[in-house]
From Swiss-Prot:
HAMAP family: Ribosomal_bS18. It holds the Pfam family Ribosomal_S18. GO terms for cellular component: cytosolic small ribosomal subunit. Belongs to the bacterial ribosomal protein bS18 family. This is Small ribosomal subunit protein bS18. Keywords: Ribonucleoprotein, Ribosomal protein, RNA-binding, rRNA-binding. The keyword RNA-binding applies.
């Protein structure tokens, strides 16, 4: 059986981390506009698959969001 590869060929878009692309050195928990981009409308942290962030930056992002929540800069849940 031979498969026609012309139908199934497409170029994958290369996943690029937002923080690596913009040369961010540190994620600050006081930067609410940046953190809001990575939170759902219900207040949950978006996964790496959705945001295309690397593991290093996803860990720092989660810590920054949690710190901002404890400092009452971001609500824990949004209604």
């Amino acid at each position: 059986m031979k498969f026609n590869n012309k139908k199934n060929t497409f170029k994958k878009r290369r996943k690029v981390c937002f923080f690596t692309e913009n040369k961010v050195t540190k994620i600050d928990f006081k930067d609410i506009e940046l953190l809001q981009r990575f939170i759902t409308d219900r207040g949950r942290i978006l996964s790496r698959r959705v945001t295309n962030t690397s593991a290093k930056w996803q860990r720092q992002l989660a810590i920054a969001i949690k710190r901002a929540r404890h400092m009452a800069l971001i609500p824990f849940i949004q209604q």
